[in-house]
Amino acid sequence: MALISIALLAPSHLSGQSGGDRLILFGDVVYFYPPGHARNCLLNNQFKRGEPVGFRMNAINPATGKRDRATELVVHLNFAGKTIDLPMRDRQNERQPEREFWVAKWIVPDDAPMGIVRYTVTAKDPQGRTGEFKPFEVQASQITIVP
């Protein structure tokens, strides 16, 4: 019984996220080829120059367990000594109401150096709550530019 009480009182963390009033962010990285392409939306972390990297994320209000479509999400890519900010867009629409997430696309530049591309995603909702997603610090799971 004591172990159950301790587990219930311990803070909960989701992929490095803190509780309270901070937004909870989660998502994945995929190929973002056009619809109908065999590799479109296929989970991946190794990309070649010229390939489309897709970021799919969600931001949840911990108090309600729901997302606010007006929340703004931004992918922050760090590579080749610079940071690129990619605003995300809400993917949900009338024809596809089940797509309750945000997306951003980045084409790997032709001059991108081989190796790991670090990224984070930040979010801010209309009420001022914020959140941040950082992938696990495991090199094999990072976005990697390959030959």
Task: State the predicted function of each range.
Residues 94-106, 113-115:
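Aromatic sugar-binding surface patches on proteins
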